[in-house]
Amino acid sequence: MIVQKKKHRSNRWLLEHFQDQYVKAAKKNNIRSRAWFKLEQLDKNNKIFKIGMNVIDLGAAPGSWSQYASNRIGKKGRIIACDILPIRPITGVDIFQGDFRNKKTLNLMLNTFSNITFHLVMSDMAPNITGNFSIDMPRIIELCKLALKISEHVLSKNGIFLLKSFQGEGFNELYKEIKMLFKKIKICKPKTSRTRSREIFILATR
């Protein structure tokens, strides 16, 4: 019965995915994933990007957020795209591959970019989803807190933190932690995010 339910969810997701207007638009316009449109909408509504920004993109694979950001910050800005998975090269984007849950890898990344002032840390990180929310949610929160830790270390004064999270157990605690570190906080759910998804975005400014 459990196997059948998982198969049903998987088939439903695949059907939705291939019928999705943003998936089709991404394919048509040589964009790496539909996540590009989420960031575009968040940016249009909140004016996140400015020319010359230095940006860290966490959970960057396959690279659609970095694709979008590189067009918005211009040649004077810099983007570091980070992920445990490999990312195909993107013009104007530096790529750092590693698992940031490993302290040595995390410290290596922080030390590598310690001389750069970052204006934006954006995180689209998510674990491999099992479909069991009691298992998935703690893993999601763990990655969110890791992104928050990185933002603490690298963000400039008035820096911006954009974080993807999910509503569920542990979210309220995470929100309180962010509220202690940032002056302005806004919770967003772009139209491009699927209606039944618990996915939300936190936009915080120092």
Swiss-Prot record:
Annotated residues for binding of S-adenosyl-L-methionine: G63, W65, D83, D99, D124
Statement: the UniProt record of this protein carries the keyword Methyltransferase: yes
Major site of localization recorded for this protein: cytoplasm
Keyword S-adenosyl-L-methionine: yes
Compartments, as annotated in UniProt: Cytoplasm
EC code(s) of this entry: 2.1.1.166
Protein keywords: Cytoplasm, Methyltransferase, rRNA processing, S-adenosyl-L-methionine, Transferase
A Pfam entry, by short name: FtsJ
Catalysed reaction equations from the record: uridine(2552) in 23S rRNA + S-adenosyl-L-methionine = 2'-O-methyluridine(2552) in 23S rRNA + S-adenosyl-L-homocysteine + H(+)
Active-site residue numbers: K164
A single GO cellular-component term on record: cytoplasm
MF terms (GO), sorted A to Z: rRNA (uridine-2'-O-)-methyltransferase activity
Domain of life: Bacteria
Function: Specifically methylates the uridine in position 2552 of 23S rRNA at the 2'-O position of the ribose in the fully assembled 50S ribosomal subunit.
HAMAP family named among the record's database cross-references: RNA_methyltr_E
Record NCBIfam families: PRK11188.1 (NF008390)
Family named by the database record: Belongs to the class I-like SAM-binding methyltransferase superfamily. RNA methyltransferase RlmE family.
Protein name: Ribosomal RNA large subunit methyltransferase E
